[in-house]
Amino acid sequence: MPRLSWCAALAAMALAAPAGAVLAQSAAPDAKPYQVEWVYRVKYGYQEEFWRIFQKYQIATLDRARELGYVASYTVVRPGLHTSEDSRWDYRIVVTFTSQASASHRGEVERALFPDKATRQREENRRWELTLNHWDLPIREIDPHADPE
């Protein structure tokens, strides 16, 4: 009997180790936050359709990534006034990941949330059809009183 208990304890530790390692990686004390700004310009007249799809997949993925500790926070903004077409944007999302490494988990989180790959791809392809321009830009805050870098 004692040998069986020892084996069961060893098996339990082996199964728990990967989960603990993942938590330790996402909460590393020396990891610095990593910010990325996603900017989207959408075809005129299609902002609502774009946003519904974006909410379904991207916002849900960001919410789950925040629950898992990969995302510290995110902010979504829209412009308050119209601009010229060459500088127009419709949505800016600033995502603060807990570290640069944590930014790489978006795909796995999305696949876990939305296992129907065909539907996800079809709907996300539609969102990209509605997107005229897009970029992801790593950004960083600076001290306005510090010397230039």
Regions found by a protein language model. Name each.
Residues 37, 41, 76-79, 96-97, ...:
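Active-site-proximal beta-strand/loop segments in catalytic clefts of secreted hydrolases
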Residues 19-24:
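Sec/Tat signal peptide C-region and signal peptidase I cleavage site
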Residues 9, 53, 105-106:
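Generic alpha-helical secondary-structure signal
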Residues 30-45:
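Acidic/histidine-rich, surface-exposed loop or edge segments in extracytoplasmic proteins
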Residues 29, 60, 64-72, 86-90, ...:
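An amphipathic, aromatic/His-enriched active-site/gating alpha helix that lines ligand/cofactor pockets
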Residues 12-17:
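Core hydrophobic alpha-helical transmembrane segments of single-pass membrane proteins
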Residues 1-11:
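Bacterial N-terminal signal peptides that target proteins for export
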Residues 43-89:
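N-terminal, post-signal-peptide region of Sec/Tat-exported proteins
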